Amino acid sequence: MPKSSLNSNYKASLARFALAGVALLGTAFTVARAETRAEPYPAWPEPVIQEKMSVEDAKAIVAERTKPQTEWKGPTDGPKAPSGSFTIAYVSPDQSYTPHVLWGKGVEAGAKALGWTVQTFNGQGTVSGTLSAMQQALASNPAAIITPADANALQKPIKDAVARHIPIIGIHATAFPGPSPELGLYHNIVSNPAEIGGTEAAYVIARSDGKAQNIHMVDNSYAIARFKAKSTTTPIANCSGCKMLETVNMPLGDASARMSPAISGLMARYGDSWWMTTCCDGYYTNVAAALRASGASMEKIKLVGADAPPSAYDMIRKGGFEVASVPEPSSLFGYQAVDAVVHAMAGVEPAHFIQPVFLIVKDNVDTEGGKNNEFVPSNNFACHYENIWKGTKNPC
C-alpha cells in the first residue's frame, strides 16, 4: 500500500476517534444535565432570634465563638461528583469587592479539585451590569451558576436558568440560608443571621457586665440588615441593666457625607460613653474618623460589627475603636457552593449545614485565616468535601 494511503487511513482513524471522544463527552454532559435538578426544594425554617440573654449566657457565647474552629461540623457523606469535565459560571456583582473575589476563589478551588472549570462574569458594581453578566453566564450554557448577587434583581434570568435545568446557587443572594423556592435558588449559602446579631449582642452584654448603653446603626432598605438589627438589639433591649439608646437608619450610600454630623448628634444626646453595633462594618471607617475628630475616647466608646472586611481586622488588631466583629467565611462558602452543585447534579437536596459563627477580637484576630484578613476555619473543610465528592477516605 502506498505511504500516502497509510497516512490517509491513519488520519481518518484519528478523526473517527476524536469524534467518538467528543460524542462521549457530550453524552456525559447530557446525562448529567438530565439528572440535574434546578428546581429548589422547600425552604428551611426561618432562623430564630434569641430574645433574652443573661450576662452568664452572653459570656458563654463569647467564650464559645472566639475558640479556634478546628472541628468539622459539616457533612460527612453525600453524593459523589459525576465524572466528566463541567464548567460553572460565577457571576460576581463587583470584582472590586473583596468578599466577592474570595468567594469566587473558593469556587475555583473546589471546582479545580474535581477537574472542572469556572468562568467568571463581572457585574462591574452596577445592577444593570450584574443583570448583563447573568445573561452572559446563562448564554454560556454552564452546568450551574453560582452568584453572590441579589436574587431579587435577577428574577428573569434565574427563571430562565431553572427552566433550562441550570441550578442557581446563591452566596449571600438572599437573607436566609437554604433553598429559596420563592426566588428560584437551589441553595443559598450564608451564615445564620440570627446568630450573627446574637453574637454581637452577647459581646456587648458580656463585656459591659450587663450595663451597656447601646446604639445600633442599620440601612433599613435591606431586609437582611433589618433582621440582623432585630437579632442584635432585642437581647440588649431585654437585658435588665442595659439600655438601647437609639437605632440610627443610615443609608450606606450616604454614610460618608452624613456620618460626621450623625456622630456629633449622638454624642450631644448621649454623651461620650456608649457602645455601637451594626451588621455592616463598612460604616466604621467613617464612624471612627468622626469619633477621632470629636476627641472621643477609645476606652469609653466601643464599636462591634459584622462582615469583617480588612479594615475591621486592621482596627481590631491595632486597638482602634472597633473591638470585635463577626466575619463570614471566605473560601469555605465557595466549597459549599460547589457541594450544592454536586447535590443538584445528583437530584438531591443540598446538605443541611451552616458553618458556626466566629467572633474576632484582639486576642484571636490573627487566627482562623486572620493573618490574611479573612475567616478561613481551620477544620480542613476542603479535605472533607473532596472525600465526599470523590468517594475517598483520606485523613483530614
PLM segments and residue spans:
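Extracytoplasmic "Venus flytrap"
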Residues: A38-D77, S85-G106, G110, L114, ...
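Hydrophobic alpha-helical
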Residues: T147-A163, T232, P251-M315
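N-terminal secretory signal peptides that target proteins for export/translocation
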Residues: M1-S13
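Sec/Tat signal peptide C-region and signal peptidase I cleavage site
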Residues: F29-A34
